[in-house]
């Protein structure tokens, strides 16, 4: 019985080593009168070496109010590896639908610009809330439409991010700059 208790305690302590905080909250952009829902995946240990990753989801027709949690397998994995992960909910129910025809560089630009503004505000607010994080090595990750937003952000604000990763974006041009990589 004593052996079983010791094994149980060891197992519990192992799980606590990998535990992390996960919560959903909202930011508010007063200039645009816009609520920006976000989900945060905080690693167990947070210090000045903790890198930040911002995830930008793909388009879902503004139907799913939790699109930013679609990639929870990735966000949780990154958090377990020690990254502070912020996943932004870009599409809101009242937003115009994404254009499905025409010159996407023109017809989808308002959506991408809205996403860039969401990312920018998120960075600015979290720098105030979590100044102890390593903001010099900020990583943006985006899938599909979120990848387009990521590439546009990297083009407009290369000095704010260290790496831009796109998973299956097809429209936005990848910035040809030394930074971000």
Protein language model annotation of sequence segments:
Residues 34-129:
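Serine-hydrolase catalytic machinery in alpha/beta-hydrolase-like enzymes
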Residues 32, 47-48, 78-80, 133, ...:
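Extracellular/periplasmic catalytic domains that process cell-envelope and extracellular macromolecules
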Residues 4-13:
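Sec-dependent N-terminal signal peptides
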Residues 22, 85-87, 164:
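Conserved beta-strand scaffold positions in the cores of enzyme catalytic domains, especially
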Residues 17-49, 159:
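A domain-start/cap signature at the N-terminus of enzymes
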Residues 181:
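Short beta-strand/loop motif that positions the catalytic acidic residue
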Residues 121-178:
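Primarily recognizes the serine-hydrolase "nucleophile elbow" in alpha/beta-hydrolase
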